[in-house]
Amino acid sequence: MRAADETTLFRTALVLVLVYLILIKFPSYLTIIIFAIALILDAFDGYFAVWQISKHKVGIARYMKATVLNDKKAHEEIMEYKHKVSETARFGPRIDIAGDRVAEYSMWVVFTYLHIIPLIILLLIIVRHSFADAMMGAKGTSSKMKSPFTRAIYSSNTSRAAINALKFITFAYLILVYVNSYPILIGYVLVGALFTFIMLRGAAEIYESAKSQ
């Protein structure tokens, strides 16, 4: 098994442990640290995939230069390696996406179960991901956004960093709401912002898929 897939499976297991810790009201600061580690590992499985396919030629500094600093030359090199991963890896990027979905659904489900997030939000998130993933998977365009809007809202490094940061802030705060009785109103604002961003990204995916037909 590839190191990237092992990392994905590990962070998936870590998220399930995280759900249990939330439910038993484990100390919030430790729970939030574990949540942060799970999110950080999401970046590392992508790196490990590139690291292996490049035969260890791409170091972490080069990868960060491409994905964080948006260096054009480094980005083109990394994208070429990622394309090779999609062609040669047994599961390609699909197992990484599955890990992302398990992690995200787990957070939405646990806070819906705790009556912090309305059920309708969870249902709409499931519908959005199900249809967007199906359409993008059929067309294989998830990393090939063509219009400036869809690139900006979905595939740009800025957009990806923003959605991950918002997920962390939102769910970390909801942990504080449940464990430490923080004010729920701020949590609702964060959930609304995250939900809106996710729906916009879903619209970008569906729009790009429809255009490619």
Model-predicted regions and their roles:
Residues 6-94, 108, 117-125, 183-197:
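Membrane-embedded alpha-helical segments that form the functional core of polytopic membrane enzymes
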Residues 14, 45, 99, 103, ...:
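Short active-site segment of divalent metal-dependent hydrolases/proteases
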Residues 21-24, 48, 52-55, 113-116, ...:
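Juxtamembrane transmembrane-helix termini
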